[in-house]
């Protein structure tokens, strides 16, 4: 079937979201359209026809076809553009993925309608044949989806490789800058002398300012000390944050753990 | 169907696992003792002279404590008098963290003060109050404002309304024992003598003051009622009578007698009756100070070679040594919660005020000397009142914050000012 | 039975006599010279080279009588021992460094120290009173060796 191992590597939220939605939609698709177990394997159903049935519209095939076409097109694009600037094109890839997701959601709706049509069919052989065909199509789709997943991964991996040396170092650098700026404003006068600690969570705007008031997640048990540390956060606005949106995204929500009197040696 | 469900769950879990991401954590260690920037704005309708304006009283009080730094408010137009008048961006630009605004209504019979304490960062009201009093209570109202602001921010009640006692020596061999506000205002003499007065001690119930007088050509102990002015000679035994120390319930006094021998510690009722020797030694034992729980007494003794501070348990009479740093440690006094002791220590040939954490035994020097003496804690334990002798020429009193960072003198005149005592919260 | 009560009463009286409750009133050190000045040999007090020296000086934070002052102390001790009517007061002092109360105790220790030396030479406690003024008469402006003279015991006689 589809390889579970493929799901394990993930690079960023969008790709993960995409992965999740793909699989969920697939599951739903399979759940609703495929009969996993034949209803009555040992009894044949006989339909009594008064006349020879006319050919019903086989619309259910079309969507899959479209999907196929779509995927093939993008697959070509991706393969072409890797040697160039993977960075910029990662954006395009992501945008396309978004479009795919949107299309998938539209497809899901269509699947609902198909299900209703399905129920009309009474002929078992016909349904069997349809099912068989569907299975084949599904496998084909999954295979191509696998390939696409793989190429998406290659693209994103390339992305990552370019930034690799810079990305984690940059993150640490900004974390250190933020830590330094706040630490020099911590007034521990109201925090006694014991080795206490307290935690705040903050949300930041790209300007480095607070989106909202800091949230106390763990109190020092001394409200005056909690308030003094919260003031230190306010005084430190605007916090030094990166301009690069991807890097900023990792820092826009932070958990700050304070030890106003330091820690024991 | 179950096969489907199992696979479904498995897939969802795997997907979620790859989705789950902890937010970044930053550890911030340490900090420094700083002062909270507060804008104490002139109150509307406050027509007083500069020194006695309400905001000036509050500013001086809060700055004395060492926890606050007042932002300059001179030359500001459109002074807000109410929280709704506050332009937060203006005060944020001035780096104010808190602000106090208010209004005063005064007539011949009463003064009414309404005020707000505002959090500038969060743009919200912390507290608002209205105080009414007769016109002569203006300074007291100012101190009450300081007390409440202090309590809201630090979690500890303020002491700005309390009183102090001190001895003033005039040039012509005249000594007075004076009582004044903490900031030195409203001073008056309660004892006048031609002989020295030392070791003043305000009783914990606020009603009396004990002191040592040399008027009988040797040291003797008096207890004086502060409301009536009546004084009683409670100790005039053979030899010296000195170092009175109130028990926490104000019912007893520890004291020092000599009887042709070295100074030794006794305990008696506050009226002078039923005196008992506390302990016997061949050394100097002096300067008793009760622990606030009434279970033990701290004292100075030279049994270790030089003066050090010890503690005796009143139950089993077990004696423990308390000070171990340096060769000269005298004059112990305790915080109301019994956790800290202030005393005088000699370092580098200079006598300095120190504070010791009685649990960790960590010692912090609060002053630089060279001749500091007679430290006593504020009723909230956050400040120490003491005497500074500058090269013997003058001596004055002042307060220092418990972390030693903020010293503020108390202006009560140019003469030799010594031997201070601090009233309790209620008196 | 009666004997027992008498015995108990006697024992009680004995204990009462040994009670450590001090006497409440103390005469001021400068008492009047009651029974006249006979046998006090005032001329000797006023002329003798050693007896005219009334101050013993001490090192910082110290209370032992230094060797150079032993002769003076001994001379006064002999005088007191020889004149049972003489009453002396030893008034201890300290310089202004340090706490008032500790200086009071230090001054006291110095005067007791002088008294102890006198006791060795036969002067009895009943003729000597020790008091202290601590730093209360010291020069509050002294610098360095100027403060030396504040660390002393003054010997005075009630008769003077």
Q: For each of these PLM feature ranges, what is it?
A:
Chain B
Residues 24, 83-148:
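Amphipathic beta-strand/beta-sheet edge segments enriched in Tyr/Trp
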Residues 164, 206-209, 250-254, 294-298, ...:
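Hydrophobic beta-strand positions that form the internal "hydrophobic ladder"
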Residues 396-427:
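Blade-level signature of beta-propeller repeat domains, shared across WD40, Kelch, NHL, RCC1
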Residues 22-36, 121-191:
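C-terminal/domain-edge helix-coil "capping" segments
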Residues 25-89, 100:
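Short beta-strand->alpha-helix linker/helix-N-cap micro-motif
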């Amino acid at each position: 079937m589809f390889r579970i191992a493929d799901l394990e590597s993930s690079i960023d939220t969008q790709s993960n979201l995409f992965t999740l939605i793909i699989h969920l939609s697939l599951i739903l698709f399979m759940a609703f359209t495929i009969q996993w177990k034949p209803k009555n394997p040992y009894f044949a159903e006989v339909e009594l026809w008064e006349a020879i049935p006319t050919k019903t519209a086989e619309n259910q095939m079309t969507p899959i076809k479209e999907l196929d076409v779509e995927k093939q097109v993008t697959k070509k694009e991706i393969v072409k553009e890797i040697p160039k600037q993977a960075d910029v094109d990662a954006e395009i890839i992501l945008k396309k993925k978004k479009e795919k997701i949107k299309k998938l959601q539209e497809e899901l709706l269509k699947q609902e309608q198909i299900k209703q049509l399905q129920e009309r069919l009474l002929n078992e052989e016909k349904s069997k044949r349809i099912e068989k065909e569907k299975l084949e199509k599904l496998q084909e789709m999954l295979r191509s989806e696998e390939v696409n997943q793989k190429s998406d991964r290659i693209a994103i991996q390339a992305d990552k490789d370019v930034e690799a040396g810079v990305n984690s170092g940059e993150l640490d650098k900004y974390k250190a800058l933020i830590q330094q700026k706040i630490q020099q404003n911590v007034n521990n006068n109201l925090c006694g002398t014991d080795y206490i600690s307290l935690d705040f969570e903050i949300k930041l705007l790209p300007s480095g300012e607070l989106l909202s008031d800091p949230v106390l997640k763990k109190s020092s048990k001394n409200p005056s000390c909690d308030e003094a540390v919260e003031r230190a956060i306010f005084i430190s606005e605007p916090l030094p944050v990166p301009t690069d949106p991807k890097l900023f995204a990792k820092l826009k929500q932070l958990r700050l753990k304070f030890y106003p009197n330091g820690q024991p040696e | 169907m179950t096969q489907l469900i199992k696979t479904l769950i498995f897939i969802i879990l795997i997907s979620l696992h790859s989705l789950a991401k902890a937010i970044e954590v930053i550890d911030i260690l340490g900090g420094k003792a700083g002062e909270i920037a507060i804008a104490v704005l002139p109150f509307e309708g406050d027509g007083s002279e500069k020194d006695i304006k309400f905001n000036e009283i509050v500013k001086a009080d809060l700055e004395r404590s060492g926890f606050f730094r007042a932002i300059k408010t001179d030359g500001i137009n459109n002074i807000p008098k109410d929280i709704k008048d506050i332009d937060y961006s203006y005060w944020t630009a001035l780096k104010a963290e808190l602000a106090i605004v208010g209004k005063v209504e005064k007539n011949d019979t009463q003064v009414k003060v309404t005020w707000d304490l505002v959090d500038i960062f969060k743009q919200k009201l912390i507290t608002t109050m209205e105080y009414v009093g007769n016109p002569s209570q203006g300074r007291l109202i100012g101190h009450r404002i300081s007390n409440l602001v202090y309590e809201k921010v630090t979690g500890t009640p303020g002491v700005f309304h309390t009183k102090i006692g001190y001895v003033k020596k005039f040039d012509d061999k005249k000594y007075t024992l004076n009582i004044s506000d903490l900031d030195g205002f409203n001073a008056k003499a309660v004892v006048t003598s031609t002989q020295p007065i030392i070791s003043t001690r305000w009783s914990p119930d606020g009603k009396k003051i004990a002191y040592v007088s040399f008027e009988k050509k040797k040291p003797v102990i008096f207890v004086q009622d502060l409301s009536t002015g009546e004084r009683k000679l409670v100790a005039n035994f053979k030899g010296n009578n000195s170092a009175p120390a109130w028990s926490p319930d104000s019912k007893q006094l520890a004291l020092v007698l000599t009887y042709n021998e070295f100074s030794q510690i006794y305990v008696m009722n506050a009226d002078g009756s039923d005196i008992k020797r506390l302990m016997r030694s061949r050394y100097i034992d002096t300067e008793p100070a009760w622990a606030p729980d009434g279970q033990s007494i701290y004292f100075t003794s030279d049994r270790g070679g030089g003066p050090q501070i010890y503690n005796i348990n009143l139950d089993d009479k077990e004696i423990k040594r308390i000070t171990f740093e340096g060769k000269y440690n005298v004059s112990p006094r305790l915080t109301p919660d019994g956790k800290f002791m202030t005393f005088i220590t000699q370092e580098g040939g200079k006598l300095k005020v120190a504070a010791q954490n009685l649990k960790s035994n960590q010692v912090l020097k609060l002053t630089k000397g060279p001749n500091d003496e007679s430290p006593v804690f504020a009723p909230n334990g956050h400040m120490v009142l003491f005497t500074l002798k500058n090269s013997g020429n003058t001596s004055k009193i002042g307060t220092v914050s418990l972390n030693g960072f903020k010293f503020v003198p108390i202006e009560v005149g140019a003469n030799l000012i010594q031997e201070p005592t601090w009233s309790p919260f209620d008196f | 039975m009666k004997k027992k009560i008498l015995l108990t009463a006697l024992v009680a009286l004995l204990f009462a006599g040994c009670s450590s409750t001090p006497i409440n009133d103390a005469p001021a050190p400068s008492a009047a010279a009651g029974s006249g000045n006979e046998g006090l040999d005032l001329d000797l007090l006023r002329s003798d080279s050693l007896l005219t020296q009334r101050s013993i000086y001490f090192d910082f934070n110290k209370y032992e009588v230094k060797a150079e002052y032993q002769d003076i102390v001994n001379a006064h001790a002999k005088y007191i021992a020889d004149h049972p009517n003489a009453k002396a007061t030893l008034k201890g002092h300290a310089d202004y460094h340090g706490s008032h109360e500790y200086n009071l105790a230090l001054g006291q220790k110095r005067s007791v120290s002088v008294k102890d030396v006198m006791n060795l030479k036969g002067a009895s406690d009943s003729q000597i009173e020790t008091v202290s003024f601590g730093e209360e008469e010291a020069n509050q402006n002294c610098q360095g060796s100027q403060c030396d003279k504040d660390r002393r015991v003054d010997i005075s006689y009630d008769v003077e």
